[in-house]
Amino acid sequence: MEYKVSAGSQIPNIEISLIDGNTARLYDETSNWILLIVYRGLHCPICRDYATRFEHNLSKLQDMNTQLFFISADPLEKAKIFAEELNLKSKIGYGLGIEEMRKLGLYVSEPRPNEVDYIFPEPALFLINPKGRLHIIEISNAPFIRPDINLILRGINHIQENNYPIRGTH
């Protein structure tokens, strides 16, 4: 069964394994916002660059009470390498399964030769508000489409400062 997430809908309550040995839910009734970045995996150089650029803005996100969270289908060892090589301090989830990918409405790809030996999600970005609702959704079917980081940061700030409503709900 295919799923489509909708603006303003509740984020699917998926439990994610983290590289630090803990688990996390995409919504846990905290007062924090969550910026969830779905990346293709360690094999993707564009993902590496994008993650690094977001991580360089981690303090800005923290100032906006927004937790940065990366997830992929990579196994633990590859997710750890991704985090270590990029010096990521954010939460890093791994082992995203096909059911979780579908619940998030992600595009899923078969690997090409010399990539990986498992299916993986294409990139996505979700801004989850403190009520667990999807405030911003960007889902891509290819690695070449990524929202501009500075625009996302300005958007989060504008949403929070102006109580800007969730758009695209009709």
Walk through the language-model features, giving the residues of each.
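Chalcogenol-based redox active-site neighborhoods
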Residues: 1-170
